[in-house]
């Protein structure tokens, strides 16, 4: 399909009104995911290319008076030199990967079948830990605050539907540990992950949010964005 010329005739490719709504919503932050969904660790990529990509992202944000301070790396690919680029351009925080060998940053070729299989199983059984963090004890990396991932909220799968209770329990149990110890539990997903099986995905999200609400009432758990920790 050809890309349209404005949000009015092509809302799937343009979303300035959505950006403005997010910017006005209390507690929400607009961060960066790079300009071109840049894969830092794939063969042939250079630091100069990454710098140009970040400069483009900053320029676009500036047009809407948005100050970018938090960053999420596409495919969770990054190295220390990429963090240094972000720091020099004013970023203060980024989402880091879970501290397990199966989540270690790598290019596509490094994502072996074994790593993928363990990551999938880890969504249903606690194979790598709860990934609860004390962000202030962890310090910084290359001058940036690392807000480490705890869990990707993977989308509903009809093939794995019998395991859904295990997936939800995996998330809730980690939230329980965070609430009991005053730690950080960082749950994330992409909006398009809910594009299929919307009812099933929203139902899971409601269960997670209801569980959070109980911890908010009983233990004072709060919902924060990445920039809040920088």
Question: What do the predicted segments below correspond to?
Answer:
Residues 147-160:
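C-terminal active-site rim and adjoining tail of enzyme catalytic domains
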């Amino acid at each position: 399909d050809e890309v349209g010329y404005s949000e009015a005739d092509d809302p799937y490719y343009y979303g300035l009104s959505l950006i403005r709504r997010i910017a006005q919503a209390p507690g929400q932050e607009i961060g960066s995911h790079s300009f071109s969904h840049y894969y830092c660790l794939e063969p042939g990529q250079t630091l100069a290319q990454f710098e140009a990509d970040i400069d483009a992202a900053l320029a676009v944000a500036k047009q809407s008076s948005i100050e970018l301070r938090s960053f999420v790396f596409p495919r969770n690919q990054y190295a220390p030199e990429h963090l240094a680029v972000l720091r020099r351009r004013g970023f203060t925080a980024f989402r880091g990967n879970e501290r397990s060998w199966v989540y270690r940053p790598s290019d596509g070729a490094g994502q072996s079948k074994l790593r993928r299989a363990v990551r999938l199983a880890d969504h249903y059984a606690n194979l790598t830990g709860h990934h609860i963090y004390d962000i202030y004890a962890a310090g910084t990396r290359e001058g940036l605050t690392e807000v480490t991932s705890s869990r990707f909220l993977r989308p509903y799968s009809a093939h794995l539907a019998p395991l859904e209770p295990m997936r939800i329990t995996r998330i809730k149990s980690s939230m329980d540990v965070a609430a009991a110890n005053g730690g950080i539990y960082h749950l994330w997903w992409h909006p398009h992950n809910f594009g299929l099986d919307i009812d099933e995905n929203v139902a899971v999200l409601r269960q997670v949010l209801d569980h959070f609400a109980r911890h908010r009432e009983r233990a004072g758990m709060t919902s924060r964005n990445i920039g809040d920790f920088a």
